[in-house]
Amino acid sequence: MPTTTGVQNDILATTLRILRDQLVDSTFKAVPLMDAVNSLGNVEKVDGGSYIDAPVILTDHSMITQLTTGYEAVSLAVKDPLRTASYSWCDAVAPVVLTRKEELSNKGERAVVRIMEARLKQTMGMFKREIEKQIVAGSSTILTDLQTLNGLDAATGWFEELAFGSQGNTVGGISKASFPTSWQNQVQNGSFAANGLKKMQQLLIDCQQFAPEGDVDLILASPISYGLYKDELQQLERYTSATEMRDMAGKLALTFNGASMYIEPNLGFTGSGGVNKMSMYFLNTRLFNIYFDQDAVFELGDMESISGYSAKSAQIALRMQVTTANLSGHGVLVNAET
């Protein structure tokens, strides 16, 4: 027969799981990149595995044969068999804890639920901050197995400040030097005050020219570069519609050639060389995929007693990774902080 404590734990865990579903949705909407990728249906939930093998688009796959008479031999020459980039999972867990003293000090099930709701929100907020820090700047000290766009400091980071065609990082086990026109990001470098809008326009053109599909639809900007862009527009600035903004958790968004631009507080960092600053990311989110293990999408476990302590906890499990099919459709604006 279940104990009273066991029943209370089950009720509490069930209540928290309902709230957890809402918080997962809020986490996606609060991170512009995750929200954009999710809206395109590029969030993949898979059955475990040790690695993620993500298909990439590097060169043309086969050759076209024109049929003039209809009797021409069809060329079956394959220029590029299916290639995959290989990524390790990022595994993480965080507990939501309630002590016996807190239970006794807050009589009534609703009081205890309120405490756990607040702690669940805190924990999910921590996950959100660490995910964003790592993806954007590679600055998380916790989720270091998660891929980062910062190639200034990480040899496996996606985006470098070097000219297109001369980059040397390794992403997903594939050397960028091996595919200089498809596995390297676009770059523009220089002061925003000098000709920032022209550099943004050129970066957009470069990304569109080399992208195998889609266009730049998301721009993440450091607070300073965002402010400089906003000042430059003056009376010409255009905001996204209320309809497009309603699900973005109140985030302010300008647009540039149809791409939504958001303030990203983790940008504006200086690379380890002490010279270059990452100011803006131009992203083609159609080329992104976010993978989750279907059993660890911020999965909330049961409330269990902690051995040796007068407390109980439920653990939130996360297993995820970020991938891209192509790098040449993305770009960075460097040193646009003045």
Language-model features: locations:
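Core alpha/beta structural scaffold of self-assembling particle/tube/pore-forming proteins
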Residues: P2-I64, A85-T338
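N-terminal low-complexity, intrinsically disordered segments
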Residues: I57-L82
